Amino acid sequence: MGRGPSIEARKNASDSKRGKIFTKIIRQIGVAARAGGGDPSNNPSLRVVIDKALASNMSKDVIERAIKKAIGEMEGVQYEEVRYEGYAPGGVAVIVDCLTDNRLRTVSDVRHAFSKCGGNMGTEGSVAFMFKRLGVLSYAHAIADEERITEAAIDAGAEDVMVYIEDDEIEVITTPEAFSRVKEEMAALGLMPYHAEITFRADSDIVVDGDTAIQVRKLLDILEDLDDVQDVYSNVDQVTLGKR
């Protein structure tokens, strides 16, 4: 009977994954700080990324250095935001958000991933119309009852509240512009989300199975593992990929 990975091997894999996450977040901090300044109290986008960094256990020193590099107080690489769109097998729509210091390298890597897995890249806007940009705040039922969270969310300006009984979860949906305000107003009432993000969500999902599901999952995994890729969105039904 074969042995599984050693403790050291598992730790190295975990450290590598953590390093990739930190690299992506540091790039996000830089872009947000350059666009809106280094003061998170006056830069909602930066505040959102800092919250994400802290939730990932990034130290405040690392965050501050990333901000200083972005606003010119320290030397650092400059990144720009780029977005690619395309289709995975089965007609699954995919959006790939990147931060890069070399567009040619990034587009080559993304195009190769699509081609390798039987998909194809599209032009700008070819699939984005199938998605909505929104803020999502996730709360556990344990922190408060559904009525209290719903009332607080509506008063704060949320767009919708969705209750998932089986998952013991309540989602508060906002516009991207209202995301930080709603989060802060609810936090002031003692309602802290266990997860918060601004994301794309598809208008409807596509169900895939068999070899198609395998290829779609492979493509999404390859894209998410690319250093320049920040986020990958698709309209595939996650249950069919075994990811929910």
From Swiss-Prot:
One GO cellular component, as annotated: cytosol
Localization: Cytoplasm
Entry-linked Gene3D superfamilies: 1.10.10.200, 3.30.70.980
Cross-referenced SUPFAM superfamilies: YebC-like
BP term (GO), one: regulation of DNA-templated transcription
InterPro entries recorded: Integrase-like_N, TACO1_YebC-like_2nd/3rd_dom, TACO1_YebC_N, Transcrip_reg_TACO1-like, Transcrip_reg_TACO1-like_dom3, YebC-like
Gene Ontology terms for molecular function: DNA binding
Record key words, sorted: Cytoplasm, DNA-binding, Transcription, Transcription regulation
Keyword Zinc-finger: no
Family per record: Belongs to the TACO1 family.
Protein name, UniProt field: Probable transcriptional regulatory protein PD_0885
Organism whose genome encodes this protein: Xylella fastidiosa (strain Temecula1 / ATCC 700964)
Organism classification: Bacteria, Pseudomonadati, Pseudomonadota, Gammaproteobacteria, Lysobacterales
